[in-house]
Amino acid sequence: MPYLREQESVANVNEAQITGDEKLVLAQLIVSAAPLFYALLPCSEQKMLTLVAEQIGEPDTELQNTYVLRHGGRVSSILSAVGDNQITTARLRGSMKLIRKLGRSERACFMSNLKRYAKELEPIDKPGTYIARLATKPASNTAGAGARLLKWFLLSSGPGLYTCHVHKDNSIAMWLNQKVGFRLISELNEGAFDYRALVLQR
């Protein structure tokens, strides 16, 4: 497959053999892709990772379609995406599933945090296929695994509208997405939102 290197392969988690230890690695990668979001969860790191691991490949969540890039059999990078303009629904249902696993006081705190967080996302009217998570293990950052996985996903998915959010201070993620063709939805909202919306029409 174009963009992948020798000894690299990509699989959907729902079709791959994922061990318990790998689920934890994937959960850690997913958290690293959106650390400020998962920091909203008022619970221990271990519980947070367990909750995230439970949602990997789970329908009606942001992680429903999660792809794993392996190099020599070892997890190198992950990408999660939600198609058909369903990101708002997936985000809501995924959050509700998290809320149900929290205690009463934790729920109130998390819901309050979510409302504040939602205001920091630049609006996207037509999300198309939304790239919800993209992360690479630190040891393989220089190998460009994340960029290759993103290119693989775009090529495999075919023509269409793709969107994502990138934190305004995450210059590496902003550069990576713009390198493969994403652009800011609006140049007018600079400074208005912590998370900038990007779009790619293929």
PLM segments and residue spans:
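Conserved acyl-donor/pantetheine-binding loop and adjacent beta-alpha core of acyl/acetyltransferases
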Residues: N85-T129
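Conserved GNAT acetyl-CoA-binding A-motif
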Residues: P127-T129, S156-K168
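Conserved beta-strand in the GNAT
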Residues: V68, R74-G83, Y130, A135
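Conserved active-site alpha-helix within GNAT-family acetyltransferase domains
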Residues: A143, A147-R148, D169-S186
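Active-site rim helix/loop that mediates acceptor-substrate recognition in acyltransferases
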Residues: E45-T66, R70-G72, A118
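Conserved GNAT-fold acetyl-CoA-binding loop/helix
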Residues: A34-E54, T88, F110
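Conserved N-terminal entry element of GNAT/NAT acetyltransferase domains
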Residues: M1-L24
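Conserved catalytic-core motifs of GNAT/GCN5-like acyltransferases
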Residues: H165, R183-A197
